[in-house]
Structure formats: C-alpha cells, structure tokens
Amino acid sequence: MKHRHLTCFFFLTTIAAQAQVEEEFYRNKQLRLVISAGVGGGYDAYARTLARHIDRHIPGNPSAIVQNMPGGGSIKAANYLYNVAPRDGTVILGSHSAISTLPLTAP
C-alpha cells in the first residue's frame, strides 16, 4: 500500500512538472495552422474555429493563425511542413484525408 502511494505521488509530480515546461515553451508564441485547402471552404472554417479556441487548451496560451496553402492534393502543404517550417511544435498541418493514399494511387 505504501508503494502505491509513493508511485502515485511520483506520477502526479511528474505531470505537473511537464505542464510547467510546456507552459514556458508556448508562452508568447504563435501557432500556425497550415491548411491544405483554399479560403472559405470546410477545412478553412474548421481551422479558423480551432484557431479561435486553441489558446485556452494549450499551456502558455499561444495565439494561433491560419495559413491556407491549397494545391497538389495537400502535397504542397505537406512539403512545406517537411522542408521549410520550423520543427519546434509551432506549425500544425491540417490536410485532406487523401494525403496518406495519394502517393499510392497517383505516383
């Protein structure tokens, strides 16, 4: 029984420390939601709704903007993320569901 309490205490303190690290990382940062669709469509509407509310759910309350990058069946946006975007967790891709099968069906 004593070991169980000690394990729970260790687990809870680890979670609290992780949340503090994330809050420090995202404080005063800007998230960019790269959407592989044009302005005014369904994906754009979802992304803009998410951008308005995401700051309340990420420690540090980062702001969020939407960047539309249509073209190539999501490949243009995916290539941007892979080749250009910073790899620090501040850029998120929102793509069509076909992006995973496109290379298999249209080589």
Regions inferred by a protein language model and the residue ranges of each:
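Sec-dependent signal peptide recognition
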Residues: 2-9
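Enrichment for repetitive, rod-forming helical segments
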Residues: 9-11, 39
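Hydrophobic h-region of N-terminal signal peptides that target proteins for export
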Residues: 11-19
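Conserved hydrophobic/amphipathic secondary-structure segments
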Residues: 23-107
